[in-house]
Amino acid sequence: MALPRPVQYGKVQRMSYGKVKEVLDLPYLLEIQKKSFQWFLDEGLREVLREISPIKDYTENLLLEFVDYYFDGPPKYSEQECKERDATYARPLKVKVRLINKETGEIKEQDIYMGEFPIMTETGTFIINGAERVIVSQLIRSPGCYFASSIDKQGRKIFSGTIIPNRGAWLEFETDTSELLSVRLDRTRKVSLTTLLKAFGLYNQQLIFNKLGEDERLKASLEKEANKGEIGNPVENALLEIYRRLRPGEPPNVENAKNLLERMYFDPRGYDLAKVGRYKLNKKLSLWKRIFNKRAAEDIVDKRTGEILVKEGEIISREAALNIQDAGINEVLVYVEDDKVFKVVGNNTVKLDRYVDFDVSDLNIKELVYLPVLNEILSTTNDVNEIKQLIKERERELVPYCLTRDDVFAATSYFLGLKYGIGHIDDIDHLGNRRVRAVGELLQNQFRIGLARMERVIRERMTIQDIDSVTPQTLINIRPVTAAIKEFFGSSPLSQFMDQVNPLAALTNKRRLSALGPGGLSRDRAGFEVRDVHHSHYGRMCPIETPEGPNIGLITSLATYARVNEYGFLETPYRKVDKKEARVTDEVVYLTADEEDTYKIAQATEPVDEEGRFINQRITVRFGEDIIEVDKHEVDLVDISPKQIVSVSTSLIPFLENDDANRALMGSNMQRQAVPLLTTESPIIGTGVEYRAAVDSGVCVLAKKDGIVEKVSADEIVIQNHDGTKDVYHLLKFKRTNQGTCFNQRPIVRKGQEVKTGEVIADGPSTDHGELALGKNVLVAFMPWEGYNYEDAILISERLVKEDVYTSIHIEEYECEARDTKLGPEEITRDIPNIGEDAIKDLDERGIIRIGAEVKSGDILVGKVTPKGETELTAEERLLRAIFGEKARETRDTSLRVPHGEGGIVVDVKVFSRDKGDELPPGVNQLVRVYVAQKRKISVGDKMAGRHGNKGVISRILPVEDMPFLPDGTPVDIVLNPLGVPSRMNIGQILETHLGYAAKALGWKVATPVFDGAKEEDIEEALNLAGLSPNGKTILYDGRTGEPFDNEVTVGYMYMLKLVHLVDDKIHARSTGPYSLVTQQPLGGKAQFGGQRFGEMEVWALEAYGAAYTLQELLTVKSDDVTGRVKTYEAIVKGENIPEPGIPESFKVLVKELQSLCLDVKLLSEDNKEIELKESIDEDEQPQGLGAFERGLEEVENGEEDDDKEKFYEDLMDASQEQDESADDDIDE
């Protein structure tokens, strides 16, 4: 066996086991976001403005045109300032508007401010109101023409077809059981197909047969109509019939009916196929695909030259079919089974370059063009420049974005031909029929909605305002546009709060594809087929990375090499094969899913010699959805890389090929939840993707130019560039991410060091020398240990705690605002009533905690007082008021305190106040933000995981001296349960452990790329080289007794992650706290400082034991007997006996409810005396739980539900019982 070869990944050298020659580097991983947004700025905005202009008033006197747009100046604040100030990172958008008055010929031009437009940051995110957000790309059904088949009750095949636009009315073809053909307009009313054809001008049987051929189904429909015995003009009758169906109850007339049909399908304002819809429609309805391989039933003649292209009875080849289409022949007769003749009708489109003799590339028309319009243009002039000019002017007629009558006839012909096997039905889950709407397009649609609303306002104002004094500024109201944009960024389900636990989470979030959202599917209606892996996903969407839970398969991830083409379809790259020589070339082609289906594609790992020739004679290839074996000369393409089928997070799993897919899914998802640790360490066993993932995620600082490091400090690097300029790089120190993890950058260059462009000069969170480093390499042993690793629990050594191996920093943000209340303004102050000096020793003179102070739960962070309500003053108080002025007015303490179970060290304080000119929400005078950092060591109850879906909860931390140790005395760090491996079939973890053991001994870092990594013999060889046992097992000694264990144990180095599900965030206890308003029962949940629900089943358990008194107090004084719980509290404080419980509040609620249903309910005691139900005790008597008031306030601010909304809480949520990862991936956060 050959030794692995050294490969340089950034600054790190790894020994790579990869054998496949990489022709193409990984593309820039955030391209889908950046490119799409750039398209929107360059073209998308212009398209929308062009669509809407000109806006005319009803008399067509005034014209308002949008001429051009530009961004005026840089953003007001930097990205960092926006986050601190809760501002939006945006630039002002200005639009040049021209107002033309046709009567006077007067023209007014103005630049109109169209609001602040959010701008994408360098890393593909948006900052909206201070929060970093990501716009997820949406995967939706592409507009186009689709046909489907189903089997009816009699076992016959029935076909249906649909033309789906980007926006506008659908047109659906249906067959009923008696083979009558009908059309459904706009998903509502059915009319006969022949009625529609008549309305389109084929007004009698002869015309219909001439156009579509004689078909029994058409005859049957026509006969049925003939039986109705209509008189008059058939076209008008058809139009009126359609109008009656679509607008029942309105008096029909021909003019209205005509307009309605025009508006529905032929008017660009109401019907839009978009570029992609036109492309798909032409592709589907073009003639050549349907006549290819059929037998011609007549001589096919090129009308322009008189040349016979195909003789009658010949099979039409692919070449001939394409020539027929380009010759402008739109109807061809072919033989179908039993020598029947069928007429195939196309949609009259041709390639432009076959008709003009100049280069058409500069016209920017890639689609097929509509022949009648082209002929019209070519017949008017022979001058090349005039033709070009006319083509540019009539581009929307040549490539119409709405339907043409020819489209409808071609679709009808396709629909009729399906019965004879002409054409094929579509698979809607195929990626050739689903397209990606990325940021740019989603924004464009939103902008279009805003402009459409603005257009209505402008039209109204045009009629109202005085024509002479009107200017563009007075007509335009930008509110609808800014509101539409704000609404999209703020509340669209596709605009997500960025997942920022670690760099990988952020990167994946930006490369995500969602089938949910407006215009997409909904979770409940999505069936199994949509969610399933499809053969067309290969190299485009990852088959592994998707959430577990209700969103499985609906939210997916972009594959590593995939890219989105101009129509929004996903493409993936392949290497071309020279078929003559059976040699793989380095030429790369990108193919969409439907193009790929016609090629035979070999695997990237297919063995080739030095020159790239296939070694094997027979080669396994993919062909459509099948996997077949062919001769080596038949192979068309070869995969570009073995990792092209998976996403970035999946390609980070070494030995993925040895893991079960379900576990690999968990592994991919859990890597995104790894907490950035205090010190980072890249994996010994990597896959070679770590470097690109870290660099492209944008958390590392890269050098902009070649130069020499002049100065390095913790928070800035100065580089003197070779071209004489100087660059200063500012590093972010201890910033809080969206999820409360710590974002910290640190320099990895020295003074005087030479740096190259694009070199990593500073590491971010979870990176190590520019490589992604989510966890730590630790020594693991697979063996049971005293039952402490039962059910996937993990036993760890105290060394991991002492040496801060798995210590992470978490930063919480607390905010306090001083508002204006009805009784006067709140005040942030050190002077708090009834608080001892001890409690405010760490506050500065303003009443704000000093940086560096250590705080624990209940400590004051910001002192704040709120005016109390006025009461009747006594004479003495009035006297004091008169002497001392207002100061003696009552205030109460509403300071911001550290919540329960929190604490740490204050690392930052930000103060914003209206007096300093900061922008604050209305009614807020001052805003203080305090950042508190905690160092969290790993502890019992934390969740850890490897990269192979092997997760577990820490059950015990053992002293180092008790851990099992190796023969040389090294204690292991972690003991895992061997039973977690066989049934789960993630053998990758074992191979990683073995290879890690050898690599550690040899001092290597290893890269073992997915599907192209180290084999079993490679690992054995590495173990031999390191002088270790080739089976990877070692004798272990018990740390407590020093005796060896009976059997040899698998020991080695594994990369283990600490996940964000930390026990400190989950553990919770309450004695007294807030109660629900209506039922007076304690709230539930940690966020509400709630209690544990004692549910129905728990009550049964106590009943079974007959524990009557325990049950009674649980249901009364510990829950909702208001008077009883106050008295009980007093009794405990005074040391007396606990009194008799009273009547629970919820019982009173029940009685009231029955009374509200007009039932007179009375309570009687044993001796038939009526028991008075006392109303609930007054507000003053009600005990306020620990700071319940602030918590109530906080709930309202955090948008938690109010107390009075009855809630049902789950039973005690144990720290180990995860709300599993599916929730984290939920699309509407």
From Swiss-Prot:
GO terms for cellular component: DNA-directed RNA polymerase complex. It comes from the Bacteria. CDD domains: RNA_pol_B_RPB2 (cd00653). Its EC number is 2.7.7.6. InterPro entries: DNA-dir_RNA_pol_bsu_ext_1_sf, DNA-dir_RNA_pol_bsu_external_1, DNA-dir_RNA_pol_su2, DNA-dir_RNAP_su2_dom, DNA-dir_RNAP_su2_hyb_sf, RNA_pol_bsu_bac, RNA_pol_bsu_CS, RNA_pol_bsu_protrusion. Residues 1175-1229 are annotated as: Disordered. Residues 1195-1204, 1211-1229 have a biased composition (Acidic residues). Keywords: DNA-directed RNA polymerase, Nucleotidyltransferase, Transcription, Transferase. Belongs to the RNA polymerase beta chain family. This is DNA-directed RNA polymerase subunit beta. It comes from Caldicellulosiruptor saccharolyticus (strain ATCC 43494 / DSM 8903 / Tp8T 6331).
